[in-house]
Amino acid sequence: MLRVAFLIILSTAAGSLGAAVGSEQAGWREVVRQFAAQHFKNPAWGYSHSVRDYKLAKDLAEADHVTLDDDVLFAAAYLHDMAAFAPWDREKEGVDHADEGARVVDTVLKGTGFPSAKIDAVRNAIRTHMFARTPVGPEALYLHDADALDWLGAIGVARVMALVDPNGGEPDGPKAVKMLEDNLAQVPSRVLSPAGRKRVPLLQQELAAFLEDLRRETDGYRML
C-alpha cells in the first residue's frame, strides 16, 4: 500500500523528475540561507532543523534514484517553518504554520533571483511538510519524509526535550514524554518513501529505548 502511495505521489508531478538539479543563478540561496539563520531561532524547529531537512531529503531521494528540483527543495526546506516565527506566526488565529508559510513564502523569494515559475512548487512542498499531511510531487514527498524522520531517534528526543520550560511552565517533563510517545506512535506510518521507510526501524528503536530507560529510571515517569 505504501509503495502504491509513493508511486502516485511521484507520478502526479512526473515532469519535475527530470528537472535540473539547480538553476545557474544560485545567488538567491545565500540570501535564503542568511534569512533563515537570522530569523529562525528555536531548538526544535529553527535553522539547524531546516538544514537537516534539506540534507536528509536529498539523501533519501538519491537512495531512491529520484531526481529532485534542487531549487524547489532548497527553498522549501529552508523556509518551511517560517510561519512558526514572528511576524508570520498566525497560530493564535487558528492558521496552521504550514498553510501560512506556503502563503507568504514568496515575500522572501521574490527579488532574490529565485525562479518565479517554481514558487508554486515551493508552496506545495511547504504546505504538506508535516507528517500528518499527504505530499504531492517528489520535492514535497522527500521534504515531508525528512521532516517526519527528524521527530524520531536521538535527534527527535533532543528536539522535544529542548522545548521543556526550565521555569516550570509548559511543556514540562511529563508533557515532553507525551510528545515523544505520540511521535513514536504516529510518525512511523506516515513516512512514505522507500528510503525513508528503511530508516524508520532504527530510529523507532532508538526513541523507544530512550522512553523505556527514562520510564525505568523515573519510577514510571513519576519522578520527572
Report residues per predicted region.
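Divalent metal-dependent phosphate-bond-processing catalytic cores, especially two-metal-ion Mg2+/Mn2+ enzymes
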Residues: 39-51, 55-66, 79, 131-224
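Bacterial N-terminal signal peptides
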Residues: 4-16
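Boundary at the C-terminal end of the N-terminal hydrophobic targeting segment
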Residues: 18-22
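Inter-helical turn/loop segments and adjacent helix faces that build the functional surface
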Residues: 112-116
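An active-site-proximal "capping" alpha-helix that borders the catalytic cofactor pocket
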Residues: 53, 96-110
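Onset of an N-terminal alpha helix
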Residues: 25-33, 50
